[in-house]
């Protein structure tokens, strides 16, 4: 069923009595179609599972906003989940949407988070985008974005997955800098404190948390993550770049299927 869920374009499929519902959130500059290969496999592995896929504001069929902050984006997803009539869901978010999913789990009832290739330690990324603020907001945007895109490992994906991403790209300067505004403009220590507070809320609520990464983040990051979010587990799929859900869609569908019994979180 295709419709709008609190002004977010989306698809709602499955039945409410087939395990914990799923909410899938795409990464920046893409749209909800990126989940199609995994959803096709999920229909075989976990038939009838209730799944809501949403286009984030400014992507796909969802209208643009004058500005984007992550708290408001999480709130928009929460409104969409409510309008869809879902029980507390497991949220799977790719890239920046994993941050949105994590904020959701810190603020609203959630049954779990599947983080697709998004580090949660904000300082390295914040330092990087602050150093590139001028080109990002000026005529050098296209060149800078090419560098970011080159680091994603799209060429590691099967040809069909590469074509899917190319067909769903929404690379606009105002969109990228809008979603990155807080990282560019707000002090790094302030963002680090916000992250720590959010992770503390997820930790205290004992929300199940799984990271599916395309590369090993290293022992220092894993030690930090274990301290901040002890219940988080990390699985690395080497050679899948920034898109492990597209590199191995059936394996990722298995990950989603395994969340069917994740417990609800009372709040």
Question: Model-found features: residue ranges?
Answer:
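The conserved beta1-alpha1 loop
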Residues: 25-27, 94, 213
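Active-site loop/oxyanion-hole signature of alpha/beta-hydrolase fold enzymes
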Residues: 2-11, 50-92, 96, 254-257
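Conserved alpha/beta-hydrolase catalytic His-Asp/Glu region
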Residues: 124-126, 142-202
């Amino acid at each position: 069923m295709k419709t709008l869920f609190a002004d977010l374009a989306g698809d709602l499929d499955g039945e409410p009595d087939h395990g914990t519902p799923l909410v899938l959130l795409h990464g920046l500059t893409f749209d909800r179609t990126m989940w199609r290969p995994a959803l096709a496999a999920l229909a075989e592995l976990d038939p009838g599972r209730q799944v809501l896929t949403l286009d984030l504001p400014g992507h796909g069929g969802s209208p643009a906003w004058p500005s984007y902050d992550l708290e408001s984006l999480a709130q928009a997803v929460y409104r969409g989940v409510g309008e869809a009539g879902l029980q507390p869901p497991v949220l799977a978010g790719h890239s920046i949407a994993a941050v949105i999913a994590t904020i959701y789990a810190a603020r609203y009832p959630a049954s779990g988070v599947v983080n697709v290739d998004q580090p949660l330690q904000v300082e390295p990324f914040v330092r990087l985008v602050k150093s590139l603020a001028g080109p990002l907001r000026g005529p050098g945007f296209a060149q800078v974005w090419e560098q970011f895109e080159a680091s994603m490992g799209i060429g590691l994906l099967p040809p069909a997955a590469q074509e899917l991403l190319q067909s769903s790209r929404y690379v606009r300067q105002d969109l990228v800098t809008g979603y990155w505004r807080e990282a560019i403009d707000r002090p790094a220590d302030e963002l680090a404190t916000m992250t720590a507070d959010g992770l503390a809320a997820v930790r205290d609520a004992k929300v199940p948390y799984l990271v599916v990464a395309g590369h090993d983040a290293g022992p220092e990051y894993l030690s930090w993550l274990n301290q901040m979010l002890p219940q988080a587990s990390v699985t690395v799929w080497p050679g899948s770049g920034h898109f492990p859900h597209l590199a191995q869609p059936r394996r990722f569908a298995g990950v989603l299927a395994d969340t069917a019994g994740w417990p609800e979180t009372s709040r």
